[in-house]
Amino acid sequence: PNHAMHHIAASGSLTRQWSADIGDGSSDEAQLLAQPVIAGGIVYTVDINAEVSAFDQKNGKRLWQVELSKDDDNEGILGGGIAIHDGRLFATTGFADVVALDAKSGREIWRKRLSGPIRAAPTVWAGRVFAATVANELYALSADDGRELWTHSGLREVAGLVGGAAPAVDAGVVVVPYSSGEVVALRVENGRQVWTESLTPIRRSDAVSAIAHIRGQPVIDRGIVYIVGNSNRTVAVDLRTGNRLWEVP
């Protein structure tokens, strides 16, 4: 949940063990954005049509496959992602659904429709599922049954990049980046704002650099939040106080 990967190194040379078809990939109309996740010896994937698949990590054998879209018109809709926690796979979709599946069988446990499309994967922590819509609205849902626990609304922004960043959580605080350039820290239990930060571009040399959207995932490591904006601004913020510790323009 805190996105801190630290220094990962592969032991020895890498060789292909297996490959598998996960469904439809990127095209002129849609981009495959969702990353795979691995847990309990199973690899989980989702394609551009919100088709979730589970494969045996050892040999690539398909264990199950589930189509999350309930409408053929939703095929090829951009966005979404997956996260796993406590035996459940949680998926967000570009057609505004958050879905909880049994990780072993793919059986649907619950489904919650949000106010708008979701471009990034959900984040799960302490019995709560956090998902942000393209309209910069963060939802905190119960991981048990999908009940809405609280919401937070950021500033609206018309222009944005393809995709989005999943919230980061640590020490009872969820940090969510919005396409407006805002970064907001909230208490996980009630959504109360702890602090807010802005990575709005200072120098706008072209149309792309003028976009404030934060595409990279925030990272929380040992009480410090690291954030990178679209204009290459990197800031480090104290998780508890919100004080900016340093910045690289």
Regions found by a protein language model. Give the residues of each.
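Structural signature of WD-repeat beta-propellers
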Residues: D47, I77, T93-G94, T133-V134, ...
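Sequence/structural signature of beta-propeller modules
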Residues: P1-G12
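Extracytoplasmic beta-rich repeat domains
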Residues: S13, W18-V37, Q65-A83, W110-W125, ...
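Short loop/turn segments that connect beta-strands within beta-propeller blades
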Residues: D56-N59, D102-S105, S142-G146, R187-G191, ...
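Beta-propeller domains
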Residues: D47-L68, S179-S180, A207, H213-E247
